[in-house]
């Protein structure tokens, strides 16, 4: 039953070139018809590995996505904000103390932030102490500033990891996106100038636990790898594959949307940005199992039809429809012309809509043109009805289309949410509502003598002091001059002595002040 199961993935591969699932296969090239015997009929071999000529199988190990892998990978992290709490204390002349608390920010260092986070997670008692405001100090007639630098740790802060480019997405990032954590850059900037985001685990690889190791068989021909048989026995071709990294792991995105870490020496181009990877979930596996069962039934139906032909020695158009090749590639086409069994080499292609096969009434499109019927008969059981319509006896199971629709709707999305900076604090005052300080570093500054006056009061006081000093200087200078004048007068009197004479009184000359005084007293 394994060969029948191998039909599944090859059936999907060509259809995904167009991004759709095939509902039918029709020859795009049809060789000349030649009569054959009934014993030459055979069920088609739908193994792509044989179509490509890759018959050399060798065991190898590869990685693929885990079953049940969820596209939204969450990365636990935390935010770290640098906060400076300042206590300003002033003691006035009478000893009254006034304390004012202020909060500012600074840019934190990533290493210090991770150490602070470890303190908080470990429940270190120093963390509780760091939640307090700095203890204010005071000095008489002086302003004392006491500051404490703290690292605010807010956790958890969860970001989404994009596996395609390892970018991180969160509303706290500028434009909603961070290009990821690398060896040289261990943090992401945020909408707040003094806040950074860091993952709890330094290595993002721990968040990319989406792979599983598997073993399969690599199919090659002459050193060229054509495809491989996976762990479940399904063959997957490398035709149309492109290079794609998931979480930094190099691999290939196959045309059916699956991803494997297979390495090949062939020159394969990188995938364009719109090439996504299909999820590998339980629902997909369940439908895949139903599809495989359906394909096995078709294989069994082909063998039953062939057995009936061999037993009854008769062929009908309906039975020939079972011999049609179900996957694109080289095969055979059968028909009956004039009661003669005919065979032709054909190359089948997949079609998505019936309009590709029957573009107009009575037209069966083969190789870009309407194929002419012979007596109302085309090939592979396709005939022209009495009303002129083309009648195709079979079509693919609806389960196949259901499976492809599931794959197309379940892809790993590229997440580009729009960041709303207004939802994140921008001003320093808003940060006080949710900060939790950490790692205190207390500093104290003592100012010069301060009378507690405002700036204009200080200038007024200085002007008054200068004016008082000027008045005092003038007063002192004036006093000094008067004292000097008195001293000089007295010194002159002492130097003149008895030589001093006065105007005569009553015709007498008074020789001295003492004589004048004595005479005055005698006269009295």
From Swiss-Prot:
Q: Which UniProt keyword terms apply here? A: Disulfide bond, Glycoprotein, Lipoprotein, Membrane, Palmitate, Signal, Transmembrane, Transmembrane helix, Viral envelope protein, Virion
Quick one: where is this thing mainly located? virion
Q: How does it sit in the membrane?
A: Single-pass type I membrane protein
Covalent lipid attachment of type S-palmitoyl cysteine occurs at 480
Q: Which residues lie on this side of the membrane: Virion surface?
A: 20-459
* Intravirion side stretches: 481-524
Other facts: Arg-352 is highly involved in rabies virus pathogenicity. Its mutation dramatically attenuates the virus.
Protein name per the record: Glycoprotein
- Organism lineage string: Viruses, Riboviria, Orthornavirae, Negarnaviricota, Haploviricotina
